[in-house]
Amino acid sequence: MPQTFYPSTFYAMQISHPVIDPQLLRSGAAQAVGVLKILANEDRLMLLCQLSQGEHCVGELQTELGISQPTLSQQLAVLRNECVVNTRREGKNIYYSVADARTLEILVLLHRLYCPEGKN
């Protein structure tokens, strides 16, 4: 679906903009960029969206998302190495969950901005 671009005046009329202090943002910019890089991969984004619903084991994630096992393992390793997910072992299963509430806030915002209304 092609995207429609609107002039900046359209956005000014539609959205009240919060005051963003660039100097304050600078102190957290590297961390913010790191999170955005992690979310910039579609498989990782979908994994985190699924995990935003609660804890899941690898088998559940593979079934629910349809991601191949090698890709799933690779992307979960990235999320673990970047401390974006927590892990918990129960028997032979490893369960994953989102580690940081800020990541959940970003996912909620992305869902609100990019997901059609009325669909989960």
Regions found by a protein language model. Name each.
Residues 1-31, 103-120:
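Amphipathic alpha-helical dimerization/coiled-coil segments
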Residues 2, 77-78:
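Short glycine/proline-rich, acidic loop/turn segments that cap or connect secondary-structure elements
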Residues 23-70, 90, 94-102:
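N-terminal helix-turn-helix DNA-binding core of bacterial DNA-binding proteins
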Residues 33-36, 77, 107:
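Generic helix-packing signal
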Residues 53, 81-82:
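Residues at the C-terminal ends
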Residues 63, 74, 80-81:
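Alpha-helical residues within the helix-turn-helix
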